[in-house]
């Protein structure tokens, strides 16, 4: 009986600790929102994909070129499905980010901000399921430079998560296709359809 009590009490304390942390996070709601959209001339049909907001204090390069796995700038993402041209996708404190978990954790100050949309493609699997994923377009699975994806102009903004503020970002720029290098005397490129695919 004492062994069970020794196991149950730490488990209950752990659950309470997690619950209290979640309540504190919920109480720290941010009034800051980012509204990301794209015009019809950039992408005329509804799209499924992931919308990103990227933030930096460094004006030397576009925020999208400062995103890194380690020591990168803060950015947040939100999945969208059937997003129409001109329709806004809202990125708020519920959107998951890295290295800052939520936009409510942004220190007040001046930043350069950019919106980005990673357009997904539909894949019908042999088991009958359909999945939406990023389609490689010869960019090496780097969605930040993948043809067809869209990005906004960089805006300089003053941000204070404690103040009510909606920053609108219009992704009107489309990343162009990657051109294949020309054939040479020694290198020829061919395409063929696999019978298995």
What residue spans do the PLM features occupy?
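Short Trp-Ser/Thr-centered turn/loop motifs at beta-strand boundaries
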Residues: 78, 133-135, 140-141, 145-147, ...
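Bacterial N-terminal signal peptides
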Residues: 10-17
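N-terminal cap/lid segment of alpha/beta-hydrolase-fold proteins
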Residues: 158-197
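Bacterial Sec-dependent signal peptides at the C-terminal "C-region" and cleavage site
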Residues: 17-30
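A short tyrosine-centered beta-strand micro-motif
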Residues: 105-122
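A beta-strand/beta-hairpin structural motif
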Residues: 81-102
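Short acidic/polar inter-strand loop motif in beta-rich domains
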Residues: 60-61, 117-134
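Short amphipathic, basic-aromatic surface patches that mediate peripheral association
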Residues: 34-43, 57-63
């Amino acid at each position: 009986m004492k062994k069970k009590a020794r196991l149950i009490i730490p488990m209950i304390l752990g659950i309470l600790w997690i619950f209290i942390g979640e309540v504190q996070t919920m109480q720290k709601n941010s009034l800051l929102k980012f509204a990301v959209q794209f015009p019809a001339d950039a992408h005329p049909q509804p799209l499924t994909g992931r919308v990103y907001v990227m933030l930096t204090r460094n004006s030397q390069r576009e925020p999208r070129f400062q995103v890194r796995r380690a020591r990168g700038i803060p950015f947040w993402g939100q999945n969208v499905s059937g997003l129409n041209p001109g329709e806004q996708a809202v990125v708020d404190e519920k959107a998951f980010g890295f290295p800052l978990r939520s936009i409510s954790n942004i220190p007040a100050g001046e930043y350069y901000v950019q919106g980005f949309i990673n357009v997904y493609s539909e894949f019908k699997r042999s088991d009958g399921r359909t999945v939406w994923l990023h389609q490689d377009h010869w960019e090496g699975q780097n969605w930040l430079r993948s043809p067809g994806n869209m990005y906004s102009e960089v805006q300089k903004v003053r941000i204070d998560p404690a103040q009510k503020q909606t920053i609108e970002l219009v992704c009107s720029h489309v990343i162009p296709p990657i051109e294949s290098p020309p054939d040479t005397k020694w290198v020829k490129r061919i395409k063929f359809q696999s019978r298995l695919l």
